[in-house]
Structure formats: structure tokens, C-alpha cells
């Protein structure tokens, strides 16, 4: 057994009772190792073997589609593999076919601009095939890790000041994002909770304490990785009990709660790991230990045993 495995023992996994037929997997900090955008050989093998075994493998990430599919290009996934992106706002197949999308109300987005201005970086993502599909204001003021993000995404970014001018009622808007230091995003979250628009959008937090970086995704009301996974399962006729979700951060929390089997990565923060027992999550190996592969291998084995028993 992997040294970091706690609740995700053979007995703990078998206690899920139902074979897994749909698994949603986060990318950063889960499928991907730290400081790398390359899926490990063992994880690649497990993904393909899961698909071959009849398990629907879905990727569920805060990244947008344009920054998700290229990282999976060499893995060999099926063209119809669902990619849940923008923290649940958009689901497309790996080949790009739209499966599901929920848009953010531009009026709400414009209202949030005034609430967040002056605290970190504000970004809005548009649903359009051509670049630029990101809108930012005051790029020159962006520093540190966020400046590196801006530089790597520069061809996709339109700089508009004030940013509200890019958010007309005719705009197809996917999500907003606020990003900055941990303290800045604590302040941003405080403002959002007390603003006039509270209750008309979702605010989903992702935190990277080691980098003093936090991201608040501003999504349409009711949208999350959880909602996207639930809609996908319903569309495929797969019961909740037959689903698994694997993740490592706060934006995975609701998805882990909803899935029949929620698996928290061993590299998650201590605060999240402490929640696992009361939330009923399994705690698996870390991303550097190919935790995704470990759990997929268990799911494949359990499914094979269940199908074998059914044939007897």
C-alpha cells in the first residue's frame, strides 16, 4: 500500500459498494504533478485502461478549454472524453463538441467590477472561438506570479478600461475571476459576500498557500464542478453512487461531496485533509505518487470483479 494512503485502503474502497462508471478528475495538483504540465506515464496508462474498461473518464478543472485540451493531447484519450472546464461553467468533448454551458449575466458581472476594483487582478472569460477571449484592465499594474500568467496568456487578452465597457448585454460571458495574494482574496471575498449582487453568482475559491496565491472564480448561480458532474451523470444515465471525483483543492470540495466516492489527494492542505473523515472522503496518495492512477486501478479492479460476479 502507498505510504500516504489513509482512508483509501482496499477495504475502504470496497465499502463504496457500487462499481465506478464515471470518474471526474481535477488537473492541477491532482492529475498533474507540481510544477509540471505533463501527465505521468502511470497516470496516462490508468486513464486509458479505465476508458477501455468502460469507465467514463471526465476531466474537471478550473482551467478554460483552451488551456486544458492541449495538455492532454498526447495522452490518447477518446475524442468524446468530457472536459468540464471553467469550474463547471462549460463542458465540451475533447474534440471540442459543446456538451453543456451556463453563462454569467453581464449585468451581474458589471456590478462585480465595482466591488472588486483595486483588489488583485480582475479577468473575464468570453465564450468566443477567436482570440482575444479574456478581458483585463490595467495590465501594467499586475506584478509577481500574476504578471507571468498575463505574459503567457497575452495573445488571448484584451485590455479594456474600464473593464465594464467589454461586458455589454450582448456578450456571451462564461465567468469572472479575481486573483491575488491570500490576504487580497480574503478581502475580495469579504466584499463579495456583502455586496448588492450577493446571491446572484457563485464564488469558488482555489488557494495555493505555498505561492501566496488565491483565485476566486465568479460563476453563474448554481454552477460548480459538482453541478457539471451531476448534469453529466444524468445525461449518461449513471447513478450518483456509481461516480467518483478526485481533487485536491477548495474548488473540488462540492464535487467530492456529491460523488458516490469522493477522493481527496494526499497533497491537499491540512485544513482540507482534516475535513475528510466528517465528509466521508477517501484520502489517497499525493499527485507525485500518481494518486489518480492508484484510485483508477482500484476502480478498474473493483468493476472487473463486480462484472465477473454478475456473470457467475
Language-model features and meaning:
Residues 38-148, 267:
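Active-site phosphate-binding/coordination module
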Residues 50, 87, 176, 256, ...:
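Residue-level signal for inorganic ion chemistry
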Amino acid at each position: 500500500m502507498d505510504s500516504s494512503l489513509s482512508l483509501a485502503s482496499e477495504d475502504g474502497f470496497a465499502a463504496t459498494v457500487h462499481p465506478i462508471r464515471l470518474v471526474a478528475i481535477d488537473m492541477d495538483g491532482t492529475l498533474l504533478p507540481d510544477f509540471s504540465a505533463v501527465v505521468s506515464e502511470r497516470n496516462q496508462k490508468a486513464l486509458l485502461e479505465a476508458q477501455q474498461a468502460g469507465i467514463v473518464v471526465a476531466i474537471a478543472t478550473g482551467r478554460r478549454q483552451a488551456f486544458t485540451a492541449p495538455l492532454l493531447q498526447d495522452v490518447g484519450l477518446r475524442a468524446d472524453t468530457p472536459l468540464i472546464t471553467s469550474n463547471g461553467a462549460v463542458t465540451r468533448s475533447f474534440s471540442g463538441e459543446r456538451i453543456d454551458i451556463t453563462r454569467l449575466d453581464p449585468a451581474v458581472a458589471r456590478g462585480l467590477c465595482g466591488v472588486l476594483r483595486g483588489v488583485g487582478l480582475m479577468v473575464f472569460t468570453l465564450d468566443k472561438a477567436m482570440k482575444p477571449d479574456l478581458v483585463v484592465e490595467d495590465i501594467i499594474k499586475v506584478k509577481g506570479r500574476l504578471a507571468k500568467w498575463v505574459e503567457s496568456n497575452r495573445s488571448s487578452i484584451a485590455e479594456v478600461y474600464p473593464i465594464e465597457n467589454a461586458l455589454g448585454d450582448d456578450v456571451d460571458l462564461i465567468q469572472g475571476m479575481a486573483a491575488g495574494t491570500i490576504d487580497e482574496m480574503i478581502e475580495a471575498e469579504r466584499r463579495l459576500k456583502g455586496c448588492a449582487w450577493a446571491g446572484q453568482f457563485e464564488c469558488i475559491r482555489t488557494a495555493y498557500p505555498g505561492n501566496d496565491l488565491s483565485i476566486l472564480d465568479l460563476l453563474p448561480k448554481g454552477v460548480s464542478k459538482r453541478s457539471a458532474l451531476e448534469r453529466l451523470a444524468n445525461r449518461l444515465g449513471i447513478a450518483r453512487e456509481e461516480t467518483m471525483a478526485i481533487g485536491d483543492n477548495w474548488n473540488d470540495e462540492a464535487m467530492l461531496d456529491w460523488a458516490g466516492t469522493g477522493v481527496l489527494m494526499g497533497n491537499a492542505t491540512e485544513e482540507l485533509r482534516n475535513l475528510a473523515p466528517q465528509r466521508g472522503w477517501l484520502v489517497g496518495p499525493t499527485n507525485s505518487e500518481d494518486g489518480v492512477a492508484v484510485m483508477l486501478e482500484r476502480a478498474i479492479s473493483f468493476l472487473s470483479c463486480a462484472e465477473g460476479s454478475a456473470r457467475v
